[in-house]
């Protein structure tokens, strides 16, 4: 199989990895209520935090990020950078639209970071710093993610990573789409702040 022919395979493998709903799995194993029935209904770490279980939220964040990192590292090792980017896109789509949960998944922030970490780690550091700075000043997880993801493609472009910049521009658009309800709540002043329980 040629390297270019591997791209669809990388996309599918990435999707399958990304579609593993770690937030839902961890909260069920811990005996908490269905994470989809509280807060934003998302299966991601921020919504898991609303259960009051910080350890579960941290575990969800780590495992969701690893989905993106593992996908791009494995695909890149097998078939090069284009396959890595395809796997990253697949992992992101899998997390947002998992077939096992009727295509209703998470918001994609942790996976976004994990993909960045696997493809160009300095950008992941910048993303996290931007997220932390925004979260510290506003205490809005959603706004922090929107700000950090908006700047990430420009950061990649500035340092000459044009293909990565294009990929993350697409991922940022998808992330904004996943946060569309959060954006509405931010505009109306009804968005939950970090640490608030459901």
From Swiss-Prot:
Q: Which SMART domains match?
A: G3P_acyltransf
Q: Name one GO molecular function term.
A: acyl-phosphate glycerol-3-phosphate acyltransferase activity
Q: How does it sit in the membrane?
A: Multi-pass membrane protein
Subcellular localization is given as:
Cell inner membrane
State if Transmembrane is listed as a keyword: yes
* BP terms from Gene Ontology: phospholipid biosynthetic process
Could you tell me which HAMAP family the record lists for this protein?
Answer: PlsY
Q: Specify the protein name.
A: Glycerol-3-phosphate acyltransferase
Organism per entry: Bradyrhizobium diazoefficiens (strain JCM 10833 / BCRC 13528 / IAM 13628 / NBRC 14792 / USDA 110)
For this protein's source organism, the top of the classification is: Bacteria, Pseudomonadati, Pseudomonadota, Alphaproteobacteria, Hyphomicrobiales
**Which gene holds the coding sequence for this protein?**
plsY
